[in-house]
Amino acid sequence: NNTISVLFSDCIYSVTDVNSQLDNAKNATTDAFLTALAKNSTMATIILQFVSSFDGYYYDRNDKPYVCKSPRPFYVVITGNRDALKTLYTDFKVKTMPGLKNKSFFTSESWTLNENNACAIISDYTNARRIKTQRNFLDIDDVSLDRNASSLQFAIGVDYSGIFVDDDYVLDKSNYQIEPDCFRVVGVSKASPSAIGDFSNIPSKPYAIVISVPNGSFAPMITLSLRKVIPAWVKKSNVNDDAGFVPASTKSFAIQKMVEGIAAAYSEDYDNYYKLTVDINKYNK
């Protein structure tokens, strides 16, 4: 229910045989989270990366000590009921805590988006002469193209207020998948004030996902999804082998393996946060 668990750790696996033991540790992490999720499917996890001053010894994977008097990263891993974590994150103003560098949210859930929380944006982000939506504000009836443009650009609005996902993750266009392949997500931003009026209901957390497609590659339907993938900051913070040195102040030995172990459990049932379909009836030249 409202009980949460908080782990403070450097999140460094204590292993010597990097090649075999790290994968075993990753798999054990996945199994532990799968076991917990089987008991409570609404259990979510937040991982916070902080950097603080440090004065002590850093031990590499061979347990060799190195004097370290420079900033080091540490992690706060919070698990519990999704709604309880959302309350904690807001009430404790986690986003503004000193030393916070990165964060990630994990949930086993996937959400359904429709005309109540998504729309085709007709006012901004487009080079079309006009976009006319159908009555549901999401599907497009017709697009009047700019004949001088080499591609069509437009945007889909999504209200993320009900989805358990980090703001920085939402803004990374590489986390999105769109079909057909000729369509591309070229940018993501908070929705402009005028775009908010394109929603059927006033959104609490509106974002605009900008899409581009070359002229001549149009399709009658597109499918947009926000994938559950390892956040970019995790890969940037990872060191595969720390033997013989102290990693940089924002990097940790094998942190990617630990996060991959957690993420694998949370993507077991759904590999996306949502999947949204938009029909486009007509393209007018």
Over which residues does each language-model region extend?
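Acidic, low-complexity intrinsically disordered regions
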Residues: 1-285
